[in-house]
Amino acid sequence: MVTINNAHSELIHDAVLDYYGKRLATCSSDHTVKIFEVEGETHKLVDTLQGHEGPVWQVDWAHPKFGVILASCSYDGKVLIWKEVNGRWSQIAAHEVHSASVNSIQWAPHEYGPLLLAASSDGKVSVVEFKENGTTSPIIIDAHSIGANTACWAPATLQQQSNQGTSGSASPQQVRRFVTGGADNLVKIWKYNSDAATYLLEHTLEGHSDWVRDVAWSPTVLSRSYLASVSQDRTCIIWTQDSKEDTWKKTLLKEDKFPDVLWRASWSLSGNILALSCGDNTVTLWKENLEGKWEPAGQVTE
């Protein structure tokens, strides 16, 4: 375990390793993003990225096929894109379509290209495509009327669609979906519609009695899809869908409430373990048993 002391002068809100686990990006209320090189149990500060004018809530690494690229989002309403070339970091783009704090960002599955999803307190969610000529093409959606707190892509999937040609064969098409959570206590699922050239609301999931703080779509591509949502109401709901046509089934992770607000949810890479971050400074692990019940699988300690 690597421990970095005094990394920032104020509260740290996010810390994310890159694809290879060699670089660590952190962000803070001190308005900065910091990049560390990590080797074994040692670390070295490489650069401090300055450009935001408010607390920086989240960072996310792009897939390495696009280069060494990092996105950051802030209370200042901006999403900044940073790139490292020959050991030097610089800001290469700014996404400034939101009128309030941008609370969450996530790069799409790399199969979709350089697409970035952002959720804002202005109630809107944006998907911005970064094109090779340096221009951007944003899609802006009215998602949650009193604020969008979080957004997460579904794993990349293909859907068979009938070919209009004479062969009558089927050609697989990308199915781009993401989930959002808002201050309206709702979880919403959105799907790209090529005819409308935007993302349309597919499902609205009701179950929380307070702000939805985080949503996480399991990375496992199986016949059943899993979503986790956590809330200010101190509950975690697991949502499952057995096929693309079915409705989503709601299951409380546990009957009694957690001791404090649940802030973050994160699936393991294999999708079988769910980690939950609670306001009482604990991180608990959960897994589904053979009967479909969720049970504790441990606790993360220092």
From Swiss-Prot:
One of its GO terms (molecular function) is structural molecule activity. The keyword Cell membrane does not apply. The keyword Repeat applies. It is a peripheral membrane protein. WD repeats lie at residues 7-46, 51-92, 97-138, 160-200, 207-249, 257-296. One of its GO terms (biological process) is COPII-coated vesicle budding. One of its GO terms (cellular component) is endoplasmic reticulum membrane. It is found in: Cytoplasmic vesicle, COPII-coated vesicle membrane; Endoplasmic reticulum membrane; Nucleus, Nuclear pore complex. Keywords: Cytoplasmic vesicle, Endoplasmic reticulum, ER-Golgi transport, Membrane, mRNA transport, Nuclear pore complex, Nucleus, Protein transport, Repeat, Translocation, Transport, WD repeat. It comes from the Eukaryota. SUPFAM superfamilies: WD40 repeat-like. The COPII coat is composed of at least 5 proteins: the SEC23/24 complex, the SEC13/31 complex, and the protein SAR1. Component of the nuclear pore complex (NPC). NPC constitutes the exclusive means of nucleocytoplasmic transport. NPCs allow the passive diffusion of ions and small molecules and the active, nuclear transport receptor-mediated bidirectional transport of macromolecules such as proteins, RNAs, ribonucleoparticles (RNPs), and ribosomal subunits across the nuclear envelope. Due to its 8-fold rotational symmetry, all subunits are present with 8 copies or multiples thereof. Component of the coat protein complex II (COPII) which promotes the formation of transport vesicles from the endoplasmic reticulum (ER). The coat has two main functions, the physical deformation of the endoplasmic reticulum membrane into vesicles and the selection of cargo molecules. It also functions as a component of the nuclear pore complex (NPC). NPC components, collectively referred to as nucleoporins (NUPs), can play the role of both NPC structural components and of docking or interaction partners for transiently associated nuclear transport factors. PANTHER family: NUCLEAR PORE COMPLEX PROTEIN SEC13 / SEH1 FAMILY MEMBER, PROTEIN SEC13 HOMOLOG. Belongs to the WD repeat SEC13 family. This is Protein transport protein SEC13. The lineage of its organism: Eukaryota, Fungi, Dikarya, Ascomycota, Saccharomycotina.
